[in-house]
């Protein structure tokens, strides 16, 4: 059973469906000379040395369909049961035909090699090493002497596929060793981000307009003053009213200065005030108390610091790395002062974060469930390469409609009969929707008092009792006695204001929702559709709207802007850009089109076959659509199977068991029943051990069942599903079936397409060495869901050099915690000692198990963090990545490139008025990249629009490099990111964000379904204990036969 360096291909490949695990073809085993094992398959139980042949990557380049995949076959031998090994292995030779092992981040000194073999590290003293692979238990000792007889080289076992020879046509020239990994600083204050290495040059040059307006500032000293208002107020609107009144009443004490206020604890002035500290007294009417007497407030103003513009100017020209945040903040507040002022002469704006909203902008309207759309604009001052720029964009969001609470409840709950008692399910739903909303009580004629809703008690008004003068009285009786008011909806519950210990009960029918309150809860599908329809604007229309905002705001005439010497240009910035070349995509050789050249970011499957079609032998269909006849469902399944087989999959034409019509009221029972029937049928056919591979589910006509189906199937039953909406199914069409087939293929382990340059190892940095690409994201619960945890998802590529298959892991963490806490973990066990785990460690180990190679590089795309979190996230998460790597092998520190992916920004790019520079929707072309003028003055960032617009204005994605140990140039990272956008599995279009980040986003949202409980009453609790308990509750475990595939697609 001795294996040589270049063995044959996998022997399992058959006629079935091309690539994947079944693909045969040329590939080499990886055993060292004299080692024991099988060079073609590496079967579990064989001794170390053998690797798997072509297997996972397909077989001969010229093989017909059913014989393998594309030309990647040469020898990525998998070594079953061989994890990352420990510190330096014993010296010895490699297998015949091997190539020089490239060093990892940690330097190694070659001391010898076998015939045609490899250099190995210097011998080290014996050390006990914990086995890191799941199948291997216990401990082993690696010594510095000669290998034991019959075991071959430990280096071949530990690094076997680093020295496996590939087909000559696919081996790129040896790349220089990556730069050594560096440890992150111990404090976020010491974090510095990499400087821009250069400016990109690849691509067709063009010019675009950006919604950035150049800002010039006079050279004035800016003073920062701390403000303390007593008694303390948390309402910004009230604080602004108090400060505005102070400025109006006490001008003589301010030396003619016009201060600007942030609404909290800071005031800024252009020049000093005539005092260091001063107290003022301001009388103000509190609207929450109604039309009562004025309240007296003490306002203390104390000088905090002085800033000048020199540091800002130095930063803008790249001579200073630290941003003078105080200066930027003062100028930003000065530009925001006019629209936030309660004395603003235009229609009143509602300020939310950096945006301003008003009904005067028009185009709004009701969007359903008691809500309406308000339009507005976003404004932010940003340091850029061209200097300070004011980023202005059109914005829109949902607001509560100003109306009686009863009207809102009827619309939100879709209730027709208000005389009925409100169900507990509806009460909880309404409670979550109204928590935190300000209302005004209307049963007093002489005054109006505002309240904030804190809850809805479970008892109806006629049963809700409280003590009054030593007697028990109901809310209904109290209103009759106190106000001579006869309540109508006595079967409905009250609203609660105040705390649980001192509650105030208010009947819904005497309360109205105040205008101008943002609806921050999750929008339903109907609301999303309506708000998108109302706000969708073509690029030319959006550009005109932005210019109109600038002209309306008239910054040149604004008193605060004049006070601080600020001048804002009234024209959009014209920016140099490039359109990157489109990558070529490889499809299966059995199709008429073996290589595809996408056009304007899209293509189709006509005359093409999946590069690695998956095999589905056992499937069935379960329908919950009561209005669809079973014959229609049967015809749909036949069409879907036909499509799958036509474009490269191998799918059994007959279901494992016949289609079953399930009942919506018993979803779980129907799923378990069809799974049990399928298992029994397979056992009857002597297919024991095999299981249902795919369950096609026709959803109910009523929304809400999708998440429950996914949770049951993926965490309890253990079967991959493809859900279909009845509406989409009835429309049908070839395109719909094709999209379903693409999703189904990757869910069962296939590949739809791969980058041609990846196959030929022509992508710099990605394909010169084994590289793993990560994507990470954190999703947070909707505002108001203060008892729900945040969910983190991390995906990692499991194939190389193709980089198309991604495994996904998910975990819960503390409520609204952005840093991913489960990247690396250590738990002390009294019996086993320290148990190491975490998502990075598991994914690195999975990569090794799938490819037989250790990643020599890491590229980490991190989604979902804002600029203010950059340092903290990088510091913590890089530390976790380092520890995860080192826990697998001493000294294992592959270089990392850490890139933040930002989609939620407000930069928009508009094309010049040339038809060859825009797509059919009027947007910039896919591949448009900008890394000058509107980008960071010195750091490594760029805007990339990788997708073609469909409706509205395309939003480019902002990529910001926080760490780069791989030495990327601008062109290399921009091209890699753009090329990867063509590998997204669910459609034949380039997508707007890099797929690993997209997949992490999908994975995190999928996991939300595993624990969502719409009818839980805990979401409204203000208890810290409840929040903590819920946040640490782990997710249910995803079944192993589901987790190993891209189930989340």
UniProtKB/Swiss-Prot annotation:
Gene Ontology MF annotations: RNA binding; RNA endonuclease activity
Compositional bias per record (Gly residues), positions renumbered to this chain: 1-53, 66-76
Domain PAZ: 404-515
Residue ranges of every copy of the Piwi domain listed in the record: 694-1012
Gene3D superfamilies: 3.40.50.2300, paz domain, Ribonuclease H-like superfamily/Ribonuclease H
Ligase recorded as keyword: no
Keywords, comma-separated and alphabetical: RNA-mediated gene silencing
Pfam families: ArgoL1 (PF08699), ArgoL2 (PF16488), ArgoMid (PF16487), ArgoN (PF16486), PAZ (PF02170), Piwi (PF02171)
Alphabetized CDD domains for the sequence: PAZ_argonaute_like, Piwi_ago-like
Keyword flag Chloroplast: no
Biological process per Gene Ontology, one example term: regulatory ncRNA-mediated gene silencing
Protein family: Belongs to the argonaute family. Ago subfamily.
Function: Probably involved in the RNA silencing pathway. May bind to short RNAs such as microRNAs (miRNAs) or short interfering RNAs (siRNAs), and represses the translation of mRNAs which are complementary to them.
Name of this protein: Protein argonaute 12
Protein source organism: Oryza sativa subsp. japonica
Gene responsible for this protein: AGO12
